[in-house]
């Protein structure tokens, strides 16, 4: 994710954290089926830099490769602390759901805001 996100950053802009997220609730897959979930869900990559948070589209099937810019958030935006199995993060007009495996990255991103 880090390598594919780098092409959407400014030259020399370092990445502090990379976080995977999705737009649809995980309950949608359980209640309607996997194929409906794939039709409605989009994966996102949050690339956190010292000056901004870049939200990138990663497509419908994987969060591995960034495919385009969705929005930018101010660096002062708090992403965590993560709670539960899936933590919700408001990102522009979307609510992104971040799985607990990325909670350490949420904490790292938020701690670098405090340090700055």
Pin down the residues of each PLM region.
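Aromatic-residue detector
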Residues: 13-14, 18-20, 58-61, 86-89, ...
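Canonical phosphoinositide-binding patch of PH/PH-like domains
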Residues: 86-111
């Amino acid at each position: 994710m880090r390598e594919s996100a780098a092409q959407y950053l400014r030259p020399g802009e370092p990445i502090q954290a990379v976080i995977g997220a999705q737009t649809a609730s995980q309950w949608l897959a359980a209640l309607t089926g996997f194929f409906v979930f794939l039709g409605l869900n989009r994966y996102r990559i949050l690339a956190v830099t010292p000056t901004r948070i870049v939200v990138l589209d990663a497509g419908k099937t994987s969060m591995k490769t960034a495919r385009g810019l969705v929005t930018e958030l101010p660096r002062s935006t708090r992403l965590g602390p993560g709670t539960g199995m899936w933590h919700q993060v408001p990102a522009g007009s979307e609510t992104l759901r971040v799985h607990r495996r990325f909670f350490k990255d949420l904490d790292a991103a938020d701690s670098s805001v405090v340090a700055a």
